[in-house]
From Swiss-Prot:
Function: Acts in the modification of cell walls via demethylesterification of cell wall pectin.
Active-site residues from the entry: D223 (proton donor), D244 (nucleophile)
Source species of the chain: Arabidopsis thaliana (Mouse-ear cress)
MF terms (GO), sorted A to Z: pectinesterase activity
Tissue expression notes: Expressed in siliques.
Record keyword Hydrolase present: yes
Name of protein: Probable pectinesterase 15
Amino acid sequence: MPIKPVLTTLIALLSIILALYTIQLPSSRSLSSIATTIGALAKYSTFFGHKHHHHHHHHHHHHHYHHHEPIKCCEKWTSRLRHQYKTSLVLTVDLHGCGNFSNVQSAIDVVPDLSSSKTLIIVNSGSYREKVTVNENKTNLVIQGRGYQNTSIEWNDTAKSAGNTADSFSFVVFAANFTAYNISFKNNAPEPDPGEADAQAVALRIEGDQAAFYGCGFYGAQDTLLDDKGRHFFKECFIQGSIDFIFGNGRSLYQDCTINSIAKGNTSGVTGSITAQGRQSEDEQSGFSFVNCKIDGSGEILLGRAWGAYATVVFSNTYMSGIITPEGWNNWGDSTKEKTVTFGEHKCYGPGADYKERVLFGKQLTDSEASSFIDVSFIDGDEWLRHTNIVSEHTSKDIGDDLIGFY
């Protein structure tokens, strides 16, 4: 470096140091409040700026928390949120004790049973390592995280450790009218090889009716998301897995979601499948519909396998990368299912959407055939969905602005 810029820099530094000496320093009390504010802002800026730094959050600034009485600093904030969310009760969860609870299950346990009004649980950034149950009495519960890359609930059971696939969940919902925003559900069990026994590992199992997930993440490998029964809505979610990673007998609409395969690549053909839908008879009103989604990742994967004889899966206006195998669909080794399944694609695009080599029981749907799958009427959402999207008029940025008053 030439000498002149070095001298200029030194002079500038010296003048700053001199200036600091001549300014009267504030009291230590206001300094600590400035530090706390900066701490909160720094934490918040990582939420909207560099999302991938979320794993640092819970190491910073917790030494400031003892300056606050948590209830005192959030009175105004909770009343504003209560008004905004139309909830009767707001509970907060924070790993460092700056909320009402330090784990999610404890907060869920105090939710009033069979409540007709909503309870909001706000979960601060961090990885909450616990196996969580929302039992059927905890109706009308809303859980709000700080972004799906910042707030996660994680466990690592498998079918082997839990005794069966369904009980390997990290988070299960049995209650009706459950809503989650901006939070992740993870199963951290190792990714199995295709065909490995008892390695299924569920991140989220949903059995409650009328559930909605906005901006949530679901992370696992085999059997990530057990969409078991009931009507469900997934909006702008991130769903990761390898084998049958969206499965079950739910009736669900997936809108604007990212489906990310982590299936292993190999030379012997198929290494994974997105869906395994469980509809068993004509009478069952179940099925999975994907609209405006994006499929990407690794491996050679199927759009779906016919788990149930009447399995129903439709992809509309969805981008499919080259990881989708040319045949697209699989009969689960039973050719009789080919007559009864509904496997459809409608106006999909991308290298994986080429249907020239699709199996005959995978259909390209007309507009009229697709129409019953592509909007919220598929899940009777016009009746119940508006009650879940209680912050539709606010972006997550606005919610974040409110949260900063507390954290």
